[in-house]
């Protein structure tokens, strides 16, 4: 019986076993396991499967998947390392360079951000996210001249894009170039003119220029439109102190404390901040947000 099995069935069984253990089959198996792990958010498992797959076969696609898995797992240095290796083989890929810049931004490696943006700009000078992120990196490194220059470049690429214009105005405000802030604010698209960010900057600008009556009017409008913006209550209270309105100051401080309490109850730790950080995040991390959700790459 065993003779006939070996004669007629043994070869088939052997071929099946060899096929199962072949590098190609094992590679496919590991990729499948990695996909399942990613779909279940088991990112460490996915990383392990993809690393094993890369040991079997070097592949740009596999390395890209591994970089993404590291990103999901919030292991940014490893993600950046693999993106660098991919870039060695895809040196003409502007999107890849932008992605490297974005990952470096999360790592607070602003020099690497600037380097990647410079390479990306040589490949694509029409993508507004590149000079915008380059400007942010320059600013973080104390290079305000180039920061302003790259934001002006954003304005040239997309004249009606709000975030770079607002960021330029904000940078100039921090540089105390108040006249230029006024000029840039004139460039803000009309539909954004009453946004929280713009109104707040205008109010702070009036305050910095010692025009307290105008500042008060702007804070009144700001709080009328955004009554839960805690920081504005605090700042308006300070103006009322300067204007000798002690009762008004007490009322605003009370409202400020109520807003903070409400935000704490709602689990919002960003009570005293504008939402411009989130708008900026959506711009210069747009590529990353296609891969990982906000809570996965904090």
PLM segments and residue spans:
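Short coil turns that delineate tetratricopeptide repeat
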Residues: 57-58, 91, 125, 159, ...
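Canonical positions in the second alpha-helix
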Residues: 52-53, 85-86, 119-120, 153-154, ...
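Register position in tetratricopeptide repeats
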Residues: 39, 72-73, 106-107, 140-141, ...
């Amino acid at each position: 019986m065993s003779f006939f099995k070996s004669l007629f069935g043994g070869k088939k069984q052997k071929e099946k076993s060899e096929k199962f253990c072949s590098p190609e089959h094992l590679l496919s198996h590991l990729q499948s396991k990695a996909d399942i792990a990613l779909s279940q958010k088991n990112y460490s498992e996915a990383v392990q499967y993809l690393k094993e797959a890369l040991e079997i076969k070097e592949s740009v696609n596999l390395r890209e998947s591994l970089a993404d898995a590291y990103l999901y797992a919030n292991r940014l240095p490893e993600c950046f390392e693999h993106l660098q290796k991919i870039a060695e083989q895809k040196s003409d890929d502007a999107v890849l360079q932008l992605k490297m810049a974005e990952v470096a931004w999360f790592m607070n490696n602003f020099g690497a951000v600037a380097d990647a943006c410079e390479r990306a700009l040589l490949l694509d000078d029409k993508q507004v996210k590149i000079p915008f992120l380059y400007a942010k990196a320059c600013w973080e490194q104390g290079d305000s001249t180039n920061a302003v220059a790259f934001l002006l470049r954003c304005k040239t690429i997309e004249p009606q894009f709000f975030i770079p214009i607002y960021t330029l105005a904000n940078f100039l405000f921090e540089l105390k170039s108040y006249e230029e802030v006024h000029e840039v604010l004139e460039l803000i698209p009309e539909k954004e003119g009453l946004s929280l960010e713009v109104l707040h900057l205008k109010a702070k600008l009036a305050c910095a220029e010692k025009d307290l009556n105008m500042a008060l009017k702007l804070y009144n409008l700001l709080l009328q439109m955004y009554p839960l913006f805690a920081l504005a209550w605090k700042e308006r209270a300070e103006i009322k102190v300067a204007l000798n309105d002690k009762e008004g100051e007490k009322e605003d401080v009370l409202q400020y404390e109520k807003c903070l309490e409400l935000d704490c109850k709602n689990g919002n730790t960003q009570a005293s901040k504008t939402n411009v950080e989130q708008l900026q995040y959506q711009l210069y991390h747009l590529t990353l947000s296609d891969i990982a959700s906000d809570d996965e790459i904090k």
